[in-house]
Amino acid sequence: MAVTKLVLVRHGESQWNNENRFTGWYDVDLSEKGRTEAKAAGKLLKDEGFTFDFAYTSVLKRAIHTLWSILDELDQAWLPTEKTWKLNERHYGALQGLDKSETAAKYGDEQVKLWRRGFAITPPALDKSDERFPGHDPRYAKLTDAELPTTESLALTIDRVIPYWEEVIKPRIASGERVIIAAHGNSLRALVKYLDNLNEEEILELNIPTGVPLVYEFDENFKPIKHYYLGNADEIAAKAAAVANQGKAK
């Protein structure tokens, strides 16, 4: 039986992950720790013998720079890459830039958990006059008004990620190419929910750690056989738990 593999990587820790802020579409870079995580992800993939034919990432530098570090470790800096806003992090609306713990202290841990992890719940929306609205950013100049978010739930994130997966990424993998996707916590949660057919309660508890390669294996019918993280299991579990705890009051 032929096994097809796909590698997903959430970007390394960003400056705002480090500061415990809601980031969304705000274009912050990797922290020093994040750069180290990205290089380590590349080394893990190299040690396991992975090479790739094509890469996908978002239009946000924390994901792009993570991919660059990984490909540099693999000596594949030349790899053809497609950048798309459809793999961006979920847009956190008016929460973008706010401290997660302070927001939890104000609104309660449960409300912030729902904003962060609820399936169809959107954070408070931005006004289109707000400088954080993506309509003011030239990288989104070709998007329609309907495509420009003022806030997003995970359900809305799925609405842009999954068609891109089905129409663009999946056919490339099905043709035999080896693909890596470097993206974000929620765009990857959207894809994992779809691939693993998770329900709304299951996805609420799913946390993807930064900078750890997640490998999916598919059968000839493109059904997931299994998935697994590369690296030390205890360290990965601790990183996932840290992600879960970000939205709690101190």
From Swiss-Prot:
Q: Where is the active site?
A: 11, 89
Q: Which catalytic reaction applies to this protein?
A: (2R)-2-phosphoglycerate = (2R)-3-phosphoglycerate
SUPFAM superfamilies, alphabetically? Phosphoglycerate mutase-like
What Enzyme Commission number does this protein have? 5.4.2.11
**What's a Gene Ontology MF term here?**
phosphoglycerate mutase activity
What UniProt keywords are attached to this protein's entry? Gluconeogenesis, Glycolysis, Isomerase
User: Can you supply a Gene Ontology BP term from the record?
Assistant: glycolytic process
Which principal EC class is assigned to this enzyme? isomerase
Listed PANTHER family = PHOSPHOGLYCERATE MUTASE
Entry's family note: Belongs to the phosphoglycerate mutase family. BPG-dependent PGAM subfamily.
Show the NCBIfam families listed in the entry: pgm_1, PRK14115.1
State the protein's name. Answer: 2,3-bisphosphoglycerate-dependent phosphoglycerate mutase
Q: Which organism is it from?
A: Yersinia enterocolitica serotype O:8 / biotype 1B (strain NCTC 13174 / 8081)
